[in-house]
A protein has these predicted regions:
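Positively charged n-region of N-terminal signal peptides that target proteins for export
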Residues: 1-4, 113
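Short, surface-exposed linear motifs at loops/turns and structural transition points
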Residues: 7
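Hydrophobic h-region of N-terminal signal peptides that target proteins for export
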Residues: 10-18
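Mature catalytic domains of secreted/periplasmic carbohydrate-active enzymes
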Residues: 20-454
Length: 454
C-alpha cells in the first residue's frame, strides 16, 4: 500500500481524536517555566534562532515508508495486503541487515541546512522501532552492530552528524524515543503486541518495567554523558509514557553537568522537563507566551520517501513568518535518503529559502512578539530591543505580488525599508490604515519590511 495512504490514515486518526487545535500530537495544556538560570538563558538563545531542522533517518528510510509506525497495532495502520502482522515485523526488523548508507555525508547535510538559513538541528538517535543510530553498548540493534555499515569507520552515525554541525554554530539536539518497540522489556514476546504502549501490566511484571527504565536511562546516559559532546537540546518523543517513568529527574542533573543549560523537551508532558512545547504539523491559533516550536515536514512525511510532494519555498517562508509572529520557532523535517545524502529536490527548495533569509532574515532572527501581530497575510515581529518593527507579507502560492500592501495599527515613523532589495519607500496613513506602494521589479516572493514605530 502506498505510503501516502498510511500518512493520510495517521492524520485522520489524529485529527479525529478531539484535539482542539488539530495537532497531530496535541500540545500540553499548560507550561511550567524552568527555574535553572542556565536553562532559561539557553532557552532565550534558542528563541533567537527561529529556524531549525529535524532529521528522521533509520530503517524506515530503506523502503521509504512511515517511520516505525507500521509496527504499531493501532487501528489506522495499513500494511501491504496479504502480509501478516508477525511476518511484517520480522521483515521490518530484517531491514537492519541491509541498511548501508555508503554515501553518508553529514558535512553535506550541514552545508545544505546552513545554506537554508537554519540555526539549530535535531537528529533521531533512536525512533520508536528501537533501531539505534548511535553506538550503544546496551543492544545490538544498532547501525554500529547489526548490518553491513558496522564495518564502516563512520558507524557511530550520531557522533559524526553532531560533529559536522557544531563547527557551523548550530545548536545541537538529540531526538530520542522513550518507547522502544524492539526491546523485550517494552513489548515482551510472551504477550501479543498491544497498541503503542507496553504489552503487559506493570503490576504483574514490575521487574520487566524496571529493566526497561534502567535500559532507557543507560542509553540516555550514553547520549548525554559527554561521548557525543555538549548538547543543547534533548528532544524526547513518545509522550504516551507519561511523567517521570523513565527516570528523567535522575538523568537531567548529570546531563546538565556535561551540557550546562541543556534544554529538555519531554514532548506533550506538562511539567518541569518540557522546556518548550512542540505542536506537530500545525500552528497554534494565537500567540503563546511560553517557548514553543512547530515541528513540520518539508514533504508529507518525516523520513525520506520516494516521489515526495514538497512544500514550496514560498510556503515555508510564509509558515515561518506566521510561527515567529506568534512567538514560536520552526523545526522543518527533512529526511536523508537511504544511502545518506539530502536529495536534490529538497536542496533546491532549501537554497531558495536560504537566499530569502540572507536578505530578509532580520525580520525573523532575534525577534520577539508584538501586540498587533497579524493583518491578513501580513505578519509582524519586533526586534529584541523593541526598537524596530518588521512586517512580512506571506505571498500565497500561485499569486503575484500586489501593487500595494495595507494594514492597520503599527504605524511607521519615517520611511520603510524593503529588505528584499534594500530600497526605502514611503508609507501613507489615512484613517488608521497604512499603505505601502511596492516598487516595480520585485520578485514574486514574500516581502519583508522594516520600520520604526511612531
Amino acid at each position: 500500500m502506498k505510503k501516502t495512504l498510511l500518512t493520510a490514515a495517521l492524520l485522520l486518526a489524529a485529527l479525529g481524536a478531539g484535539a482542539q487545535e488539530s495537532f497531530v500530537h496535541e500540545r500540553s495544556n499548560g507550561y511550567v517555566w524552568p527555574t535553572d538560570p542556565a536553562v532559561l538563558e539557553k532557552l532565550d538563545q534558542w528563541q533567537d534562532l527561529k529556524f531549525g531542522v529535524l532529521m528522521h533517518w533509520g530503517l524506515y528510510s530503506v523502503p521509504g515508508i512511515v517511520e516505525s509506525w507500521n509496527l504499531c497495532n493501532d487501528d489506522w495502520v495499513v500494511r501491504p495486503e496479504g502480509s501478516t502482522y508477525e511476518g511484517y515485523k520480522q521483515w521490518y526488523w530484517g531491514l537492519s541487515k541491509v541498511f548501508n548508507p555508503v554515501n553518508f555525508n553529514p558535512e553535506q547535510w550541514a552545508d545544505v541546512f546552513e545554506d537554508a538559513g537554519m540555526k539549530y538541528m535535531i537528529f533521531t538517535t533512536k525512533h520508536h522501532d528501537g533501531f539505534c543510530m548511535f553506538d550503544t553498548q546496551y543492544t545490538d540493534f544498532s547501525v554500529a552492530k547489526a548490518g553491513p555499515f558496522a564495518d564502516n569507520p563512520k558507524k557511530d552515525i550520531a557522533k559524526y552528524v553532531f560533529d559536522a554541525f557544531r563547527p557551523k554554530g548550530f545548536m545541537i539536539g538529540a531526538y530520542f524515543s522513550k518507547p522502544d518497540w524492539h526491546c523485550e522489556w517494552f513489548w515482551n514476546p510472551y504477550y501479543a503486541t498491544a497498541r503503542r504502549g507496553i504489552n503487559y501490566k506493570v503490576s504483574l511484571h514490575p521487574d520487566w518495567w524496571e529493566n526497561y527504565v534502567t535500559f532507557t536511562k543507560n542509553q540516555l546516559g550514553e547520549i548525554t554523558g559527554g561521548r557525543y559532546g555538549k548538547l543543547d537540546i534533548l528532544w524526547l518523543d513518545g509522550g504516551w509514557i507519561t511523567g517521570d517513568q523513565v527516570g528523567l529527574n535522575e538523568i537531567l542533573p548529570e546531563a546538565r553537568r556535561v551540557s550546562p543549560g541543556l534544554i529538555c523537551v519531554d514532548r506533550t508532558i506538562k511539567g518541569p522537563n518540557e522546556n518548550y512545547q512542540t505542536p506537530e504539523q500545525s500552528i497554534p491559533k494565537t500567540q503563546l507566551a511560553n517557548p514553543w516550536e512547530s515541528c513540520m515536514t518539508l514533504g508529507t512525511d518525516w523520513g525520506w520517501t520516494p516521489n515526495p510532494r514538497f512544500k514550496s519555498a514560498r510556503k515555508v517562508i510564509g509558515t515561518l513568518a506566521e510561527i515567529t509572529a506568534k512567538g514560536g520557532s520552526l523545526a522543518l523535517g527533512v529526511g536523508p535518503t537511504p544511502d545518506g545524502v539530502i536529495e536534490e529536490k529538497a536542496v533546491v527548495i532549501l537554497k531558495e529559502i536560504g537566499a530569502w533569509l540572507r536578505r530578509c532574515g532580520k525580520a525573523i532572527y532575534n525577534t520577539r512578539i508584538t501586540e498587533h501581530y497579524n493583518d491578513g497575510d501580513i505578519w509582524f515581529n519586533i526586534s529584541k530591543d523593541g526598537q524596530t518593527l518588521y512586517a512580512i507579507y506571506a505571498l500565497p502560492d500561485g499569486e503575484s505580488l500586489p501593487a500595494t500592501l495595507t494594514w492597520t495599527e503599527n504605524i511607521p515613523k519615517g520611511q520603510v525599508t524593503i529588505l528584499n532589495n534594500g530600497k526605502k519607500v514611503k508609507a501613507t496613513v489615512k484613517d488608521g490604515q497604512v499603505t505601502v506602494k511596492l516598487p516595480k521589479g520585485l520578485a514574486d516572493e514574500p516581502i519583508a519590511l522594516m520600520f520604526n514605530l511612531k
